[in-house]
Amino acid sequence: MSKFLLILLTLCGLGAGPVMAWQDPAESGQEVVDSTAVPVRPDYVRLDSWAGRLNGWTPHILSDLAAILAEAPSHGLPGQERLAEALLDPAIPFAQRAELAGLAALRYAGWLEYGLMEAETHGVRGLYASEAGYLVSRLQDGLDAGDLWPVFAERLPQVRDYDILRAEMLRILALRPIWPEITPGGSLRVGDSGPRVDQLRARLTAERLLLADWQTGAPYDTRLETAVRRYQGRVNLSPTGRLDQPTLRQLNVSPEQRIAQLRANLEQRRWRTRDLGDRHIWVNLADFRLEAWENGRLAREHEVMIGGQASSTPEFTEEMQYIVLNPWWGLPAGSARSRFQSMRRNPSIVDQYGFRIFNASGDAISVYEIDWSRWGNYWPYRMSQPPGPTNPMGEVKFIFPNRHNVYIHDTVERDRFIRTRRDFSAGCIRVQDPLALAEWVLNGQDGWSRARIDDVVAGSSPTVVWLDQRIPVHIAYWTVVGDVDGRVRYLHDLYRRDGRVIADYAALHDAFSGQGLPFPSGLARAGNTVRR
């Protein structure tokens, strides 16, 4: 790589030195580091060794690439303004701009396809040889066709709300200079008036929940109350219609905070597999919601309960293999120990709930055979509960084997679905209207109509139904979501997982935006290194 291009890369954020003018880094005391070598994993490839294989650049394609790079902020990615300017600068020899374009295109395509940050370590996400080869092949196809736009469009995540979140990002970026704020104070309700009511109207107008036809000084009316209710629904608050303190805190979240949250959520979309499955189930834990999708269409929605903070439900993807109608419940160790204390005081509980107790050899024993003085607080037995009206599994469970031992199931506590916040389980996912979900899961499977499902459930025999076609189950934790109607909702960070993701992504985002070194020493805690 030429010294000229190294200097150009440094100036455009593809190099490591924070040189801010057209100046030889050696004269400025800066060391030119060829940061086209990507950090973190030794099996990540150098971008320059692959980008140099791209050919067919023309002034028109360079102009298109500059426009493509200019869209980076809408994707929550670092701004590429200086790169775009360099690509269009006639003072820079065309051959050098073409070489720069190859590096910029490959890096940006990698960001869109795989992300800027590693999902597990939060270090910089580089490219493996197979990934670089694939992207170079697709980029070369675009160069041969004289059009890079479709190539980059194909790199975008396939989750349905990605474009909705992009539109929200553009809206907030545009509003940032004039973001309305509400003066802190007491709650407001219908009939109140004053400057804070005007501020509330201005803020909800910015949220596109009110038309800008209201009069200054007008009292808090039912129209404003309706807008407040709609806003509260967006942020998962109880829809009281009053400006209470939780609602005020959400309304006064700064645009910078919202932008940081959106950037992290857009990045999380890039971490997800691109092939979700023609038929798949999507669970967003932060939204307490399950969605069943078929051929790109939302087929069903279900409310869910998830694990509490002490037993939080993990994020993962696995394939549903079978369902169980009238399932037994194998008590987890924690539940068994708590039941043990109750049974010690009142052994009749075992018969009341139909529990079965098994010793270490797997033999069933009677509760009256247990020598309580021998075991103290230790519980060496397994416990199971057969199907029935008190079985916490309810009428059906959906099994997608995984290392977390998490599955979806019915519940006997169905009245708790009316709550807004539903973190009541021990880690599994309890679903509302589970037999309707079972009907969808078994749709098209010979012999399994809703009528047959109901007939089986009306009995008491456990019945395992293996799926002819496995169904991917994706469990995510996303605190910003876009609904099918285009509405964006900001959700409560129940598990407090957002903070680290937002902070670590912001650090990388700022570094690659030219606000610091692309791989600064301050990020070494994430395992980053810079190699020549």
What label would you give each PLM region?
Residues 21-36, 126, 148-532:
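Well-ordered beta-sheet/strand-loop patches within structured domains
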Residues 6-15:
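Bacterial N-terminal signal peptides
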Residues 1-4:
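Positively charged n-region of N-terminal signal peptides that target proteins for export
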Residues 110-169:
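Histidine-centered catalytic/metal-binding microenvironments
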Residues 22-131:
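Cationic-aromatic interfacial patches
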Residues 46, 53, 105, 117-118, ...:
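Short, solvent-exposed coil/turn linker segments
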